[in-house]
UniProtKB/Swiss-Prot annotation:
The keyword Transferase applies. One of its GO terms (cellular component) is cytoplasm. It comes from the Bacteria. The gene is queA. InterPro entries: QueA (IPR003699), QueA_dom1 (IPR042118), QueA_dom2 (IPR042119), QueA_sf (IPR036100). It is an enzyme of class 2 (transferase). Keywords: Cytoplasm, Queuosine biosynthesis, S-adenosyl-L-methionine, Transferase. It comes from Solibacter usitatus (strain Ellin6076). One of its GO terms (molecular function) is S-adenosylmethionine:tRNA ribosyltransferase-isomerase activity. Transfers and isomerizes the ribose moiety from AdoMet to the 7-aminomethyl group of 7-deazaguanine (preQ1-tRNA) to give epoxyqueuosine (oQ-tRNA). One of its GO terms (biological process) is queuosine biosynthetic process. Pathway: tRNA modification; tRNA-queuosine biosynthesis. It catalyses: 7-aminomethyl-7-carbaguanosine(34) in tRNA + S-adenosyl-L-methionine = epoxyqueuosine(34) in tRNA + adenine + L-methionine + 2 H(+). This is S-adenosylmethionine:tRNA ribosyltransferase-isomerase. Its EC number is 2.4.99.17.
Amino acid sequence: MNLSEFDYHLPDELIAQEALADRAASRMLVVHREQGRWEDRCFRDLPEFLRPGDCLVLNDSRVFPARLFGHRSGVHSLAVGKNNPKRHEFLSGAVEVFLLRAVSQDGRDWQALVRPGRKMRTGERIVFDEGLEAEIIARGEFGERTVRFLGSGDLYAAFDRIGHVPLPPYIKRDDSPADRERYQTVFAREKGSVAAPTAGLHFTPEVIERCQAAGADVATVTLHVGLGTFQPLHQEVVEEVKLHTEHYRITADNAGKIGAATRVVAVGTTSVRTLETAARDGVLEGETDIFLYPGVPFRRTGAMLTNFHLPRTSLLVLVSAFAGKDLMLAAYRHAVEARYRFYSYGDCMLIV
C-alpha cells in the first residue's frame, strides 16, 4: 500500500487559525460506514448519536507550554593581569527548544527538538529566562537532542511561567494568552502532551452532561501526545511505517467502564490508539507505537470522533482504516467543498 493513496488537496484558507469563541459551535461531519454516506451536522448534535450502553472515552492528557526560547551560553576569556585569565559566560545566538517528553526518572532529562540544531553540540548549554539552564547531553537518530535541566526546582512550574503554547506549524501566528485555555480540553488533567488531543477541544461540561443523559458512560484514558503523531510520514510503503513511542495509561476503574460497554466511542485518535494498544497487548500502562492502517483490526473501538487530519499522515491512514479508504477520502473531498474548517482548531468528524 502506497502513502500517495492517502493524499488530498486542501486550500490554505480552510486551515483554522483561531479557535471558535464557542467550543461546541463546530460543525460535525457524520460518516455512516455501513451505509457509505455522510451528513452535515453540528457538534452539539453528538448526544443524538449516542445510546445506552455506550462508553465515551476521553484522553485527559494536559498540554504544557513546551516551547522555550533561550540563548546559547558560551565561554569567553578575559585577561586580567599578565597570568590571571578570568573566565565569564556570555550569551550568544537565539535558540528554540521544543520539549517532547521527559526521559529520566527524576524528570530533568528531556527529549527535545533544538533549533538551530546543526550548531548545537553535545555539552553546550542553553540559558532561558529566570536563570533556567539546560545542557545538551546526547543526540538522537532522528536529529532530536536530549537536554538536561540543571539545578533544582519544579520544572513544570518554570515551563508555565516562561514557556509558550506549542501550536502546530500550520497555525501561522504566535501563541496568545487565549491559547493557554483554548488549546486545552476542559477535562485535561495529566500534564505531558506537546500537542492537544484536538477532538476533545469541542467538548463543554454541558455537552458531556447531555451525553450522559443520553445513556452513555464516560471514561478517561491518558496518552501523552508527542510531535511524531502529527508529522508527515517519510516511508512510501505504508506497511513499513514506524511511529515514535508515546506513553499511555488506563486506570483499573476506567478499564472496567470500557470493558462493560456495548459500544466504545473513542474521542480522538489518541484515545483510539490507547484502546487498541491495551486490547492488543493486554497491558494498561506502557509505551505504544501502534500504527493502525487498512488491514489491521480494530478490537475495541466501535465509533470515533476525530478532527480532520493532514494529508500523508498516520492519522489520516488510521481513520481510513476505520471507515474505509474510499469512503474517507470521498468524505474529505466533501468537507473541502463544503468549506469545513480543518486541523487542530477546526471542525470534527463522527464516524459511526
